[in-house]
């Protein structure tokens, strides 16, 4: 099932039926470059070959491999990965200074990027409020780590990588 007209993205499977909720291409009401869940402006691409279907999220103006955003949240000493097309068959792993650290922990929360954006707006902008999302992952890292990479493997075996420098 594919649905839309929300301003956030969500994917889940229930009773053997896969449901895609696609965010509006305008993101958070044309109010910036993200949706309420922190996902970039973009759209879903479905590829059908014979009796198989696969899909990915295409961020507007970005390469096809742009499937996540990494943020270091100093207040909790953790790296947060927002993997906007995530579903339960994906794997999200962290590498700190070249060392494999294992799978990140999924949690429900607000995108750090969208929360910061909302907090920077003038009072009275309630329609830009971020929404809780379940496609966030976090892992605490040692305070001496300089570079972090996150490797995401989707349900089709495609691998995506993003890296950030810490301080």
PLM features: what roles do these ranges have?
Residues 1-72, 91, 100-102, 118-120:
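Conserved beta-sheet core of the metallophosphoesterase superfamily
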Residues 66-167:
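Long, low-complexity serine/threonine/glycine- and acidic-rich segments characteristic of extracellular
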């Amino acid at each position: 099932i594919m649905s839309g007209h929300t301003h956030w993205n969500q994917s889940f499977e229930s009773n053997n039926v896969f449901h895609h909720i696609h965010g509006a291409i305008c993101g958070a009401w044309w109010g910036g470059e993200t949706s309420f869940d922190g996902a970039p402006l973009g759209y879903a691409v479905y590829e059908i070959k014979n009796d198989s279907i696969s899909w990915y999220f295409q961020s507007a103006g970005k390469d096809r491999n742009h499937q996540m955003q990494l943020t270091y949240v100093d207040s909790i000493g953790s790296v947060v990965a927002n993997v906007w097309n995530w579903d339960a068959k994906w794997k999200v792993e962290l590498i700190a200074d070249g060392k494999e650290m294992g799978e990140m922990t999924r949690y429900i929360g607000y995108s750090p990027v969208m929360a910061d954006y909302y907090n920077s707006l003038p009072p009275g902008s309630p329609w830009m409020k971020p929404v809780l999302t379940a496609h966030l992952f976090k892992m605490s890292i040692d305070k001496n780590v300089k570079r972090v990479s996150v490797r995401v493997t989707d349900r089709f075996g495609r691998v995506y990588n993003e890296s950030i420098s810490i301080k």
